Structures are given as C-alpha cells and as structure tokens.
From Swiss-Prot:
<feature type="transmembrane region" description="Helical">
    <location>
        <begin position="33"/>
        <end position="53"/>
    </location>
</feature>
<keyword id="KW-0406">Ion transport</keyword>
<comment type="function">
    <text>Part of the energy-coupling factor (ECF) transporter complex CbiMNOQ involved in cobalt import.</text>
</comment>
<feature type="transmembrane region" description="Helical">
    <location>
        <begin position="102"/>
        <end position="122"/>
    </location>
</feature>
<keyword id="KW-1003">Cell membrane</keyword>
<feature type="signal peptide">
    <location>
        <begin position="1"/>
        <end position="27"/>
    </location>
</feature>
<protein>
    <recommendedName>
        <fullName>Cobalt transport protein CbiM</fullName>
    </recommendedName>
</protein>
<feature type="transmembrane region" description="Helical">
    <location>
        <begin position="207"/>
        <end position="227"/>
    </location>
</feature>
<keyword id="KW-0472">Membrane</keyword>
<keyword id="KW-0169">Cobalamin biosynthesis</keyword>
<dbReference type="Pfam" id="PF01891">
    <property type="entry name" value="CbiM"/>
</dbReference>
<dbReference type="GO" id="GO:0015087">
    <property type="term" value="F:cobalt ion transmembrane transporter activity"/>
</dbReference>
<keyword id="KW-0171">Cobalt transport</keyword>
<dbReference type="InterPro" id="IPR002751">
    <property type="entry name" value="CbiM/NikMN"/>
</dbReference>
<feature type="transmembrane region" description="Helical">
    <location>
        <begin position="134"/>
        <end position="154"/>
    </location>
</feature>
<comment type="subunit">
    <text>Forms an energy-coupling factor (ECF) transporter complex composed of an ATP-binding protein (A component, CbiO), a transmembrane protein (T component, CbiQ) and 2 possible substrate-capture proteins (S components, CbiM and CbiN) of unknown stoichimetry.</text>
</comment>
<keyword id="KW-0170">Cobalt</keyword>
Amino acid sequence: MKPLHRWLPVVIGAALLIIFESRAAYAMHIMEGFLPPVWAGFWFIVVLPFWVLGLRRINRLIAGKPETRLLLGFAAAFAFVLSALKIPSVTGSSSHPTGTGLGTILFGPLVMSVLGSIVLLFQALLIAHGGLTTLGANAFSMAVVGPFVAWLIWKGLKDRAPIWLTVFLAAALADLFTYVVTSAQLALAYPDAVGGFAASFARFGAIFAVTQIPLAISEGILTVLIFNALQANAQTELQSLGVLKGAQA
C-alpha cells in the first residue's frame, strides 16, 4: 500500500486547492433552497435508510479489515475532487463528474452512499456546491442511485467482459444516471405548466446532456486508469475486498 500513501496527499491537496480557489457558482447539485420544503424533506426520508445501512457496513468493514481505511479515504477523496470540478454549462450553471464509481467498485453501493453523502455535505459547507436543505435530494441521485447503477454493472459484467470495459461502463453510467435522477427530481418539483412532468424532465435532461455525456466518458476513462494503478499497487487489498475475485484483467 505504500504507493497509496504517496497518492492520498496529492488527492487531498487537489481538494484543498479547489476549496480555496473556488468561486461562487451554481453547480449541478441542486442548490440551497431550490426545492420546495415538501420535496426537500421527502428526499431526506428516502435516503435515510441507505445512510443507516451504509454506516453499519462501514463499521463492520473497519472492524474486520482495518487495513482498508486508507482505501476508504482514497475513494472519498477521489469523489470529492472529481465532483468539485466545475465546468460551465449552457444554463449558466456548471457540470461536474461524480467520482462515485470507483468507491462503489471497491466497497459496494451502501458504503458509497455514506461516503458520497459526506462529500456532498463538505461541498455544501466549504465550496457552496449544493446545500443543506437539498442534501437529501443530491445524496439520493449522486450517492445512492449512481452507486447502485455502478454496482449492478460491475457485478453483472466483471466476469463476462474485459475488466477495463466493466470499470469504464460502471463509472460512466453511474455519472449519467445521477443526472437522469436529478432531472426527474427537478421535474417533480417544477412540472411544466403545459406538458407536466414529462416536458419538464425532457427539458432538464436535454440541458444536462450537453455537458454531462462528455464528462461521463472522461470520468470512465480516468476511473479505468486509477483502477489499473490500484491493481498494480494494492492487489492484496483488492483481493481481500473481493474486487478482483473472478475478474480477468
């Protein structure tokens, strides 16, 4: 694990740079106060069971395999850095990767639901990404749905397809489905006056797709590169987690 000890400060340093250099901007996370209170509360209720189960899973993981703590921190830092990158969007807001695919492959979707939510909380507090009232909605899309999509792809394809392709699809589609859900959340809260939910969903989805599809592809490629590096430098830990069991490089 020595190489990871060298990488983790780099990832954390990049995160700190983003924190201190970030400027006010609207992010693809749903911003503070944007959702009506009823919907904001609804998404907290929906995501709460995942947090409870995820915390239990993390406690068992750390108790049984304390050597994985560094990888947990690395996965969280990776998600923080990627999801904090802001790229201008056609709406005057910004788009960003999600970074949840890697942690999901390593630890599963329940663990990532907690890590991703912690990332979102820190972003809301430190760099004005998202918000506290919209944390439930943002956590459901980025920290729950995205990771579960990545997990289904990983579990379904890792024994049937080249591992690089499986990692790419897991990361890229987790990113895309995050914004499909975000579009649905916004459409539910603000249906079109004429076309209702469907028209509003199509409008939000079309806006997000302009920047999010290229970002998802880029995130998939980057996640493959990082995963390959982990295979080379942390193979024992990956085997201990069951990540490489039955997978062919």
